[in-house]
Structure formats: C-alpha cells, structure tokens
Amino acid sequence: MATIDLNSDLGENTPDRPVSDDAAMLRIVTSANVSCGFHAGSPEGIRDTVLAASRAGVAIGAHPGYRDYENFGRERLDLPAATLQAHVEYQLGAVWALARSVGDAVVYVKPHGALYNTMAVDEATASVVVAAVKAVDPSLVLLGLAGGVALDVADRAGLPTAAEAFADRAYTPQGQLVSRKEPGAVLHDVDLVARRMVRLVEDGVVEAIDGTDVAVRAESLCVHGDSPGAVGMAAATRTALTGAGVEIAPFVAGAR
C-alpha cells in the first residue's frame, strides 16, 4: 500500500490577519508546519497551534521564514549569511521551546515562502539554512521541494531529508513551482487537485502548466490552509487518496 503525508502551514493567524482555519486543517493533515513568528503569527497563537497539533496527534514541524511580516514572507531578502543563520536558529528555538512546553517535540523543518523557494534553486542559501538546522538539532528532517537544490545540500551535509509536492500549485516543465505572481500559479478546482495528487502518489508524475508530465517523487503533500476553499480542497484530497487505497501518515518515522 502506498503511503503519503499531508502537511499544511499553520499558526499564521493573528487577530488583524486571520488566514486559515487551523482547527479544521488539523483534522485533515498528519504534519503541521508551524509558523515561527517572523512572517506571520503571534506567540500566543503559535503556542495554541502547537498544543492543538499535539492533542490531535499531528507531527509538529518548524516553519521559519524571512523576517518579513508585511509581505507574509513571500519576498526574497538579501541577507548576510550570518544574519540568515541566526534568524533561522532563533525561529527554530521558539517553536522548539513551545513544543517542549506542551510535552511534545519538533521533528522536522520546512522553510516558508520565499526562503523555501530560494533554497530550492540557490545552493548558498540552502547551505546557510541547513547549517542552522544542524546547529539546533541534527536529527531534524528538512522537508523541501522534490527535485530542489536544498535536499541535495542537506544530503551532503548529513541532514535527514524528505521530498514534498504541492497539491494546489502549478508546476513548470522543469519541476519548479510556478511563481505566485504568474497567472494559474494556484489551483482552485477541487476535483482537479484531488485527481492530480492521486496520480502523483500512484504514478510519480504531475501535469505541468504547459500540459507535459513532470516526474515528481514525494513523501509529503502540502495542502495550503490560506487559500480560498482550502479546507474543502484538503478534505477532498485526503478522501480521494484514501479512496484510492493510499495510507495517510506522518512522513517522519515514529513521529506518532
């Protein structure tokens, strides 16, 4: 039986900027990418999310991003390596401590937004983030874009890795995500997304934006919680996968 993890970006809500229904998503996903506070979220809200994930039996991951609250961490920042490493270590420490305070633990790291995308294509940035993760806890798994540079850098550094695909994002023929600035980058057809993910898990391919097939092997699928109809799309994706005989479970062995 095929097995796949479902992950979502959570802990990003604040009273002035609610973006997702975390409670609903935690009933669907098996791994939670919890905001570390730099791009979104508040200390209280992040702790609430960590506690809720723990109670739901969902694996907890840290979701560090650029220090860019205004743009939700979606703009690339040109930072000195030492600054970026300190920022990542700081963020990991925050969620690590909150998880510990509720009797749980962070088991993986998935960078956010522009940092994630930059790491997928830029070896220098990936090397800095990998160094930060190793400095905090070398047992943490780095979750990154399937086929991206970041996973190669982490593998060479001896950091555990897992490959990820995106349920609601369009792909280029080269296997990269289509920029959110481009038309058609985010998919909204629930049935289409569900079918795409079943095909990805069963056949290891996804249709690119130009209609060609791209090989994608992933251990986790991201179902975003901050897009319109996100909960319904995530639920439909899970239902389609289980209906196809796919087991849904955390990608980190022994996380739950």
From Swiss-Prot:
The EC code for this enzyme is 3.5.2.9
Swiss-Prot/TrEMBL GO biological process terms: carbohydrate metabolic process
Q: Tell me the first and last residues of the signal peptide.
A: none
Keyword annotations: ATP-binding, Hydrolase, Nucleotide-binding
* Reaction it catalyzes: 5-oxo-L-proline + ATP + 2 H2O = L-glutamate + ADP + phosphate + H(+)
Q: Does the keyword Nucleotide-binding apply?
A: yes
Recorded hits in InterPro entries, A to Z, give:
Glyco_hydro/deAcase_b/a-brl (IPR011330), LamB/YcsF/PxpA-like (IPR005501)
Q: Name one GO molecular function term.
A: 5-oxoprolinase (ATP-hydrolyzing) activity
Keyword Translocase listed: no
What the protein does comes down to: Catalyzes the cleavage of 5-oxoproline to form L-glutamate coupled to the hydrolysis of ATP to ADP and inorganic phosphate.
* Record family assignment: Belongs to the LamB/PxpA family.
The record's subunit annotation is:
Forms a complex composed of PxpA, PxpB and PxpC.
Name this polypeptide is given? 5-oxoprolinase subunit A
